[in-house]
């Protein structure tokens, strides 16, 4: 598993309202990307809190959907309007199969060569008063050699990102992440 990460604050802000984490529990690799609502320090704090809580619950033994449901309930009970979008990838390192859960998150992309498939769901972020019966399940993935999964936040324009991914050629994950961020600054 190879990762590339890049984050930039909105319009020159020194703080980015996004946060991410990558960790392993037994044979499962988890990748989390959260986008706090708003910009700057407040958004960053919301995103980092979501990451911290989800990571703690998953490493304690909760299944990913259960951890997300608990985070949703916590935000609803707290009722302070602070919330974060969630991209949560759970990938079995032995089989390369996994689930991608998206709550309120910008689209993700699966790239192989010049082919790009957009992945998105209609679930709102946790804490917006939506019960589990209105949440969509995750998207099942079976990753193949040479495929790249790209997770983005709403700071990256969809059309520009898709175009870049179709035409960028073979890049390392780090180079690809830098190119995706460049799409945001050019738009």
Language model regions located:
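PP2C/PPM family metal-dependent serine/threonine protein phosphatase catalytic domain
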Residues: 2-17, 68-78, 106-140, 172-173, ...
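Active-site-proximal, acidic helix/loop segment immediately C-terminal to a metal-coordinating Asp/Glu
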Residues: 39-60, 124, 129-130, 143-187
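Short flexible coil/turn linkers enriched for glycine and charged/polar residues
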Residues: 11-13, 25-27, 80-82, 94, ...
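N-terminal entry segment of metal-dependent catalytic domains or homologous docking segments
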Residues: 1-36, 42, 49
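Catalytic core of PPM/PP2C metal-dependent serine/threonine phosphatase domains
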Residues: 1, 44-113
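Short hydrophobic-aromatic micro-motifs
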Residues: 29-32, 100-101, 149-152
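Short, glycine-/Ser/Thr-/acidic-enriched flexible segments
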Residues: 8-10, 27, 37-38, 105, ...
């Amino acid at each position: 598993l190879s990762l590339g990460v890049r984050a930039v604050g909105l319009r020159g802000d020194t703080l980015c309202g996004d946060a991410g984490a990558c960790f392993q529990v037994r044979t499962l690799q988890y990748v989390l990307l959260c986008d706090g609502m708003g910009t700057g320090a407040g958004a960053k704090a919301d995103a980092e809190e979501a990451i911290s809580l989800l990571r703690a619950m998953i490493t304690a033994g909760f299944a990913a959907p259960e951890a997300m449901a608990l985070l949703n309930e916590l935000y609803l009970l707290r009722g302070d309007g602070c919330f974060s979008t969630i991209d949560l990838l759970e990938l079995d390192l032995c089989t390369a199969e996994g689930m991608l859960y998206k709550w309120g998150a910008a689209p993700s992309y699966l790239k192989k060569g010049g082919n790009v498939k957009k992945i998105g769901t209609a679930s709102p972020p946790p804490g917006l008063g939506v019960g589990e019966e209105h949440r969509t399940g995750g998207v099942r993935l079976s990753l193949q050699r040479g495929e790249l999964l790209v997770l983005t936040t709403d700071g990256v324009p969809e059309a520009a990102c898709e175009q870049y991914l179709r035409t960028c050629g073979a890049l390392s994950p780090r180079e690809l992440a830098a190119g995706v961020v460049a799409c945001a600054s050019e738009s």
